[in-house]
Amino acid sequence: MSFRREKFIEFGGPDGGNGGNGGSVIFVASSAVNTLLYFRYNQHIRAENGKAGSGKGKFGAAGRNRVVEVPVGTQLYDEDGNTLIADLNNIGQQYTVAAGGRGGIGNAQYKSSTNRAPTYFTYGTLGEEHCVLLKLKIVSDVGIIGMPNAGKSSLLSRCTASKTKVSDYPFTTLEPHLGVAYANGCELVLADIPGLIENASSGAGLGHKFLKHIERCVILLHLVDCSLPDIVSAYELVRQELKLHSQELTGKQEVVILNKCDLLSEGEVREKQKLLESSTKKEVITLSMGDELDSLIVFLHAQVKKAVVTEPSDTSFDPFLYVHYNKK
């Protein structure tokens, strides 16, 4: 509230300006970040308050918005973690988590023909305050799946510049890794999903943490270790866990590769290839350590372009998943 006070002006009248609107908290999907680690140490995010109005009819400045970059694939849930609020799938997509309050109204706005000197004003409204849960699902063209020690990390490191850990023991990979492969003008994002074991759909071997990321992959690249005594059972075990987790996963297009063929003779490889093709009713590709991969990348790129992406349905909560992203 303010009144005009100047020399030789006896009845200056009201001149209190309006207050500025408060800033909003906005989340924006960005390729510049790939983890939610920022929120581990910044759990309370505030935008700037609007400035107060002043005399001479001056309006207060609006508060600046607080824009927070989040990885592409971030999902926002309500406080209970049951209701999906927003799904930021595309670069630049944004969502206003909490809108700023409206600025107050100065007494100059209440001047009328019957009230030439109003002594009242209106306070501004409070901004919104929300508690949201964040979950990150990796988004990739190809999800590399299979049992532990099937050679998934080795394939990713050969196709891309990914620095994933590669060793000859199960569960070498304990978190998803992304890599970008290039061949003959084709660009492909591959995700190394940690190995799936029996009862993964029930949470065994951190199954829930891994299976949910497969939902965002366009197609699946299923690696089967050629050296296993029963390759059909190994294949069917992984497929069963996908089915138990979500029927949508079983509908995704799948490319089957018989890996580590250099460990067996050509005759043994051919026999196992026919056995797996007979069981899966799909064409099975054989792969050895020394094989060139450009043709495989081009083939996968073509399959991705033809595939239909299914919408995810998972609503579990994993706030601080760390995703490694490597670009060749």
UniProtKB/Swiss-Prot annotation:
GTP binds at residues 146-153, 171-175, 192-195, 259-262, 290-292. One of its GO terms (biological process) is ribosome biogenesis. Residues 140-309 form the OBG-type G domain. It is an enzyme of class 3 (hydrolase). It is found in: Cytoplasm. PROSITE patterns: G_OBG, GTP1_OBG, OBG. Residues 1-139 form the Obg domain. Disulfide bonds: none annotated. Its main location: cytoplasm. The keyword Zinc-finger does not apply. Mg(2+) binds at residues 153, 173. Keywords: Cytoplasm, GTP-binding, Hydrolase, Magnesium, Metal-binding, Nucleotide-binding. Its EC number is 3.6.5.-. Monomer. Belongs to the TRAFAC class OBG-HflX-like GTPase superfamily. OBG GTPase family. This is GTPase Obg 2. It comes from Anaplasma marginale (strain Florida).
